[in-house]
Amino acid sequence: MDLQLKQWRSQQQNESEEQGSAATKISNFFFDQIQSQTATSAAAAPLPLFVPEPTSSSSFSCFSPDSSNSSSSSRFLKMGNFFSWAQWQELELQALIYRYMLAGASVPQELLLPIKKSLLHQSPMHFLHHPLQHSFPHHQPSWYWGRGAMDPEPGRCKRTDGKKWRCSRDVVAGHKYCDRHIHRGRNRSRKPVETATTTITTTATTTASSFVLGEELGHGPNNNHFFSSGSSQPLHLSHQQSCSSEMKQESNNNKRPYEANSGFSNGRSDDGHILRHFFDDWPRSSDSTSSPMSSSTCHLSISMPGNNTSSDVSLKLSTGNEEEEENMRNNNNEREQMNWWSNGGNHHNNMGGPLAEALRSASSTSSVLHQMGISTQVFH
């Protein structure tokens, strides 16, 4: 037992001496590097701070050339109980790099080279080589700490189908995809469909409205002042949108001049319908509601003075169409616009047509002049 203990002690002493000599060699290497850096630098930067002094109590005093092998070995023996030689070497190197960082100086490449070599010798699970390391050395980074492989073509669009295909376009600046795939995964909305709805409305002034009404009732020379004293309000003519309504309106416009100039002497229209509702008394109270003018009938309001009294007679010219007559009963604004004798009754022109025939028939008991007791000489 004593022999084995003596052999074990001698072996431990030999190992400690060998480790002490190796530590001395490493310390001399670092000291030479620091001395070269301080000698080549023009200004006395913080590098002299790392030069160990004999009186310094730092942990690097054991690496100074003035220190003996016994002191370095004794210091390492004190710390060797906690760290192995490789761990101690790495700890001293990291402490030196940390001092460079505290001083704000650039860390020399020689101090980083051992770390890089140690990382390269480790397992590939902890470090992955850059793909451009061999083909493009100028693109080779110092090291890569990522978990996945680097992109072999960083300027190429990353749009893939999950297999082998990949987009061949260049990426947009500041993005991962090209201009075609930059909106990948973004919701797209349809453009709103614009439907243009046009409504055609025509407005006529008083002159235009009186001209249209003059065309409907007659074109003779005696009808020049028939609607001369109409109201100054414009008439709003609604445009027919359907084709059937337009055709109906055109047919009515084509036959109105003939109906106005025919005189209605036989009491029948061109279609063979018997004219009825020739006289229609409207109430004196007029509504203020406006409605579009019909094309077949007209409402006339006449005020005739006589026997110090005035009476209003409303006349309606009918063509025998029941629908048009029903529609004309709703046109209350027309009798206000067509009141040409409301200002005094000074227009006594010779009128033709069914209106003149009704006024001239003195023998008829249902005549307006017979009921009012007015002589027919006033209108001749």
Curated annotation (Swiss-Prot):
It is found in: Nucleus. It holds the Pfam family QLQ. The QLQ domain and WRC domain may be involved in protein-protein interaction and DNA-binding, respectively. The gene is GRF4. GO terms for cellular component: nucleus. Transcription activator that plays a role in the regulation of cell expansion in leaf and cotyledons tissues. Component of a network formed by miR396, the GRFs and their interacting factors (GIFs) acting in the regulation of meristem function, at least partially through the control of cell proliferation. Residues 151-195 form the WRC domain. It comes from the Eukaryota. Residues 82-117 form the QLQ domain. This is Growth-regulating factor 4. Residues 297-320 have a biased composition (Polar residues). It comes from Arabidopsis thaliana. Keywords: Activator, Nucleus, Transcription, Transcription regulation. Its main location: nucleus. GO terms for molecular function: ATP binding. Residues 228-245, 285-296 have a biased composition (Low complexity). One of its GO terms (biological process) is DNA-templated transcription. Induction: microRNA 396 (miR396a or miR396b) negatively regulates growth-regulating factors (GRF1-4 and GRF7-9). PANTHER family: GROWTH-REGULATING FACTOR 4, GROWTH-REGULATING FACTOR 5. Residues 1-21, 222-270, 284-330 are annotated as: Disordered.
